[in-house]
Amino acid sequence: MPHAFKPGDLVFAKMKGYPHWPARIDDIADGAVKPPPNKYPIFFFGTHETAFLGPKDLFPYDKCKDKYGKPNKRKGFNEGLWEIQNNPHASYSAPPPVSSSDSEAPEADLGCGSDVDKDKESRRVMTVTAVTTTATSDRMESDSDSDKSSDHSGLKRKTPVLKVSVSKRARRASSDLDQASVSPSEEDSESPSESEKTSDQDFTPEKKTAARPPRRGPLGGRKKKKVPSASDSDSKADSDGAKEEPVVTAQPSPSSSSSSSSSSSSDSDVSVKKPPRGRKPAEKPPPKPRGRRPKPERPPSTSSSDSDSDSGEVDRISEWKRRDEERRRELEARRRREQEEELRRLREQEREEKERRKERAERGGSSGEELEDEEPVKKRSRKARGRGTPSSSDSEPEGELGKEGKKLAKKSQLPGSESARKPGQKEKRGRPDEKPRARPVKVERTRKRSEGLSLERKGEKKKEPSVEERLQKLHSEIKFALKVDNPDVRKCLSALEELGTLQVTSQILQKNTDVVATLKKIRRYKANKDVMAKAAEVYTRLKSRVLGPKVEALQKVNKAGAEKERADNEKLEEQPGEQAPRELAEDEPSTDRSAPVNGEATSQKGENMEDRAQEDGQDSEDGPRGGSSEELHDSPRDNSDPAKPGNERQDHERTRLASESANDDNEDS
């Protein structure tokens, strides 16, 4: 359970980045900001800053005195330990206990507030005032001139500790004017060792004067301490004698040196500039000063070491610039070299390819096919070989190629840096593939030949479409060629010629019946007789190829049937009128069947003709029998069961075509 605290309790408060700090639970004043729930208002001794902390970060002072009450190097910590013991009721309105040239009252002095020190300092001030009253007017003029010159030169001067403090106090007493620097004669009289001592001593009070609230404290909370007023600065001048630290120098801020204003204004300026150093210590706990702090701590810049450091920084910057320029030049040179090498390689590759073409042309063979397949072979060879150094056979024309490559590189560099970077990237990618380029020429030739043959085979396979595809293509060409708007007779004739040369089977024709239909229509194309004749020729070719000798047999049967009908008609005319109507009645169904209504009607007509030929016993009986036997031998499907629907359909199709051809022949005759 965390301890419950009351206002006025002394505690050690723990902040992140700070040790356990001596503090006090503070009262909440009327109108003040109320703390969040479960937090107490804390007043830190030494820094006189406030914050809100929870009970888990607070530890009773009496219990933890031995544990956390040890001296620490942190600014204000030791002063806080002294305050919590000797002045536990201190508030942020009281001056801090640290002794420095900017402390506000002599009452808060830590180890230097004795009466003996005050007496000594007062005597010192009295003697100095007596000496310096006579020379104040002269010094004012000389010092003001020196201040102006120092401002123009940009150097902040520092004086010995005792001289500056005495002259400051004398001037404050006489004319209330503060001069930040002493005349050059006094500065030149100093030895470099003394200036180094004073510069070292200037930093000692800054380490000790950590009790100022504007500076770094344990928490950047509410800062109650404000900039001291003019009356406080006057009291400071009188209280400076009560301090035993003789290492107090004139404030080196540029405001005091340039304007030569009063001591109160100079001190207030310094105090205004110092708060940024401890603005938010919670965010930056390290004790190092901020970036703004080094401005007032710069007075030793008059020494040659500071000027050397400034010049050294300038030299470093110039060196960095030079290095950057050198790197850029090196990169540009590398890019140019890479471009030249790339161009050389491309030239060499082109020459090699030209030589190979010549060799191929000399050797003979399918030169046209090789030329067609050259471009893909080029790409593959480039990828496989990489971009290594040129071989021994290609090393002779390097001089000429180098000149050409330089010219091309200059041209390629004009568009911009992007064109220069790309070949560099290609070069880097191609470097690991340098070795494969050393292959013998014969191996590459054989490999390319094999690749060319494989490509030729693939091309042949692709170029050879199926018969069905060609048939469909020719069919579409014929249709387009015989448009009503713009007929193309030549194209139609060429397509019909090619169609007649196709090796068409019955299966293909069954799938593409529309081709046969178009051929039938074109046979009656009255616009051009050549097209009609060609279509009839192609139609008969297709029939002869598909049906074979069966067509001839059917034609013979049809001719025999026609002759028989004629003979019968003659007999009927000769016979008496009674028998004629019977025979005519018998012949009526046959004539009705012979009408080409569908494929079945044509097939039935053909069958009736065959039956009649067999009954008469004429010489033409051998024809249909032979045709049927050949039909059985030619088509494997005829050997299968005739009861199947597929076989019946094929038979009907064939008989239909045969009967139509026979009818056409009869019509022509």
Curated annotation (Swiss-Prot):
Q: What happens when the gene is disrupted?
A: Mice show severely impaired post-injury muscle regeneration.
Q: Kindly list the biological process annotations in GO that this record carries.
A: DNA recombination; DNA repair; DNA repair-dependent chromatin remodeling; muscle cell differentiation; muscle organ development; positive regulation of cell growth; positive regulation of double-strand break repair via homologous recombination; skeletal muscle tissue regeneration
Bias regions of kind Basic residues — which residues? 155-172
Select a single GO molecular function from the record's annotations and give it: histone H3K27me3 reader activity
> Compositional bias of type Low complexity: which residue ranges?
127-137, 252-269
List localization entries. Cytoplasm
Q: Could you tell me in which tissues this protein is expressed?
A: Ubiquitously expressed.
Phosphoserine is found on 114, 137, 165, 229, 231, 233, 239, 268, 307, 366-367, 391-393, 395, 450, 454, 620, 628-629, 635, 640, 659, 661, 669
Report the protein's function.
Acts as an epigenetic regulator of myogenesis in cooperation with DPF3a (isoform 2 of DPF3/BAF45C). Associates with the BAF complex via its interaction with DPF3a and HDGFL2-DPF3a activate myogenic genes by increasing chromatin accessibility through recruitment of SMARCA4/BRG1/BAF190A (ATPase subunit of the BAF complex) to myogenic gene promoters. Promotes the repair of DNA double-strand breaks (DSBs) through the homologous recombination pathway by facilitating the recruitment of the DNA endonuclease RBBP8 to the DSBs.
Q: What is its quaternary makeup?
A: Interacts with trimethylated 'Lys-36' of histone H3 (H3K36me3). Interacts with trimethylated 'Lys-79' of histone H3 (H3K79me3), but has higher affinity for H3K36me3. Interacts with IWS1. Interacts with H2AX, POGZ, RBBP8 and CBX1. Interacts with histones H3K9me3, H3K27me3 and H3K36me2. Interacts with DPF3a (isoform 2 of DPF3/BAF45C). Interacts with SMARCA4/BRG1/BAF190A, in a DPF3a-dependent manner. Interacts with SMARCC1/BAF155 and SMARCD1/BAF60A in a DPF3a-dependent manner.
Name the UniProt record assigns to this protein: Hepatoma-derived growth factor-related protein 2
From what organism does this protein derive? Mus musculus
